[in-house]
Amino acid sequence: MPMQGAQRKLLGSLNSTPTATSNLGLAANHTGAPCLEVSIPDGLFLSLGLVSLVENVLVVAAIAKNRNLHSSMYCFICCLALSDLLVSGSNMLETAVILLLEAGALATRTSAVQRLHNTIDVLTCSSMLCSLCFLGAIAVDRYISIFYALRYHSIVTLPRTQRVIAAIWVASVLSSTLFITYYDHAAVLLCLVVFFLAMLVLMAVLYVHMLARACQHAHGIIRLHKRQSPAHQGFGLRGAATLTILLGIFFLCWGPFFLHLTLVVFCPQHLTCSCIFKNFKVFLTLIICNTIIDPLIYAFRSQELRRTLKEVLLCSW
């Protein structure tokens, strides 16, 4: 089966451009004008997916092993790692299937291949939606822990957390099934873009509010101890830098993919847009990179989780 015919419906079929032969080159659009096209080698794509897979498996194993990590916050982090694991795993699986089909090593009927790709499509789309949802859930959890600290354990109970997690998984699977079924409708793509923007705005508002509260708290401590104001300014700058990195990574890794979907709706035949479409695999690679970065931001900063992770690694040896 050719490369174009094997690409996924919702995600891959949006980019009908064949894989480039050079790592970085100028491809011509319909008028012959040069387009910047970055080709991601399959080996690099699979390697990044493997790193993400191993990293997130370790996070899930560490949280499952340590009962002290069975709190609501770590449940969300564990589900984020699991969804990131599925994002990288499903993309690796589809890439491997395509390579095997092109090499003739996997000979099967067209109907069976189509069913396989439909299954992978649903898995990929639902895991992406779950990943975005759990990033938002972690932001909400941290917001409640700061602004409702005394009532946190009565608001964010483990049964409620489990119901939220179940609702996210079920809603993501059902939504992705509908998206894959009606992938050729512009409303489907716009719904995905609006969902991404909603998560971005939610995270930005919550984290900015948390930063403002932290700065107020630091300022109060400084006034109590009658220290100089530069310390407060330094804290504010560090907090702003951390917030910029957190939201910046989220936007840079996910934004290009949803920009691609937006352009598919509004300018599918435009020459400039067609140049952007040629870099679809780059956008998927950025999402894989985000699944590698997520554990570094949300999981590995925990001393308890790092200690448990060392135990898991020692046991594996």
Swiss-Prot record:
Q: Which residues are glycosylated?
A: N29
| PROSITE patterns recorded | G_PROTEIN_RECEP_F1_1, G_PROTEIN_RECEP_F1_2
InterPro entries cross-referenced by the UniProt entry: GPCR_Rhodpsn, GPCR_Rhodpsn_7TM, Melcrt_ACTH_rcpt, MSH_rcpt
Q: Name one GO cellular component term.
A: plasma membrane
Residues carrying lipid (S-palmitoyl cysteine): C315
Q: Which residues cross the membrane?
A: 38-63, 73-93, 119-140, 164-183, 192-211, 241-266, 280-300
Please give, as recorded in its UniProt entry, the membrane topology of this protein. Answer: Multi-pass membrane protein
Q: Which domain of life is it from?
A: Eukaryota
Location comes to: Cell membrane
Keyword vocabulary terms for this entry: Cell membrane, G-protein coupled receptor, Glycoprotein, Lipoprotein, Membrane, Palmitate, Receptor, Transducer, Transmembrane, Transmembrane helix
Location (main, coarse): membrane
Any one GO BP annotation for this protein: adenylate cyclase-activating G protein-coupled receptor signaling pathway
Residue ranges, Extracellular compartment?
A: 1-37, 94-118, 184-191, 267-279
Q: Please list which residues make up the signal peptide.
A: none
Describe the subunit structure. Interacts with MGRN1, but does not undergo MGRN1-mediated ubiquitination; this interaction competes with GNAS-binding and thus inhibits agonist-induced cAMP production. Interacts with OPN3; the interaction results in a decrease in MC1R-mediated cAMP signaling and ultimately a decrease in melanin production in melanocytes.
Homology family: Belongs to the G-protein coupled receptor 1 family.
PANTHER family (UniProt xref): G-PROTEIN COUPLED RECEPTOR
Q: What is the protein named?
A: Melanocyte-stimulating hormone receptor
Q: Tell me the organism.
A: Saguinus imperator (Emperor tamarin)
